[in-house]
């Protein structure tokens, strides 16, 4: 299960946004069809290993993206990284989607598709192997990715949980 983290202030980071998906939604009403747009956005600061996601809905695409950026800034989390990769293999789940993250050696790059790639690059991960299993719905894939990222623990966390020094591991 994901750990509860303290709120991070978006103003203290240099966040870059990346639009993952834009979906046109039509609501059929008595007088015709009402068109609107839904945007899924990921923001992150690669140098600080901070990333967040959010969605926005509006009648126009730019307003939907703006709302998605505002929503994602309220949803930031810090990620434990080992140099440029994830510290260990982890499996994140949400709905019928699963995302597997595996550490990779230097020079591998981000081997990921679509929504997972957007999250990894925004978080500052430079070398990682990923596999998306199950659904390819970007909302569920991103939530599964964030579940996996929340499970990451570095050596200091493991040592503290075991009541040992980092050198003893």
Regions found by a protein language model. Name each.
Residues 1-169:
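Ribosome-associated RNA-binding proteins
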């Amino acid at each position: 299960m994901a750990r509860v983290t303290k709120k991070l202030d978006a103003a203290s980071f240099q966040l870059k946004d990346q639009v993952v998906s834009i979906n046109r939604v039509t609501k059929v009403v008595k007088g015709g069809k009402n068109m609107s747009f839904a945007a899924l956005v990921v923001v992150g600061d690669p140098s600080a290993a901070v990333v967040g996601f959010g969605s926005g809905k509006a009648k126009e695409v730019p307003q939907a993206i703006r709302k998605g950026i505002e929503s994602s800034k309220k949803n930031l989390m810090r990620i434990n990284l080992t140099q440029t990769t994830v510290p260990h293999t982890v499996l994140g789940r949400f709905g019928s989607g699963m995302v597997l993250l595996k550490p990779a050696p230097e020079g591998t790059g981000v081997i990921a598709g679509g929504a997972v790639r957007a999250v990894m690059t925004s978080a500052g991960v430079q070398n990682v192997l990923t596999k998306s299993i199950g659904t390819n719905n970007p909302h569920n894939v991103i939530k599964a990715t964030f579940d996996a990222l929340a499970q990451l623990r570095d050596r200091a966390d493991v040592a503290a949980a075991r009541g040992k020094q980092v050198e003893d591991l």
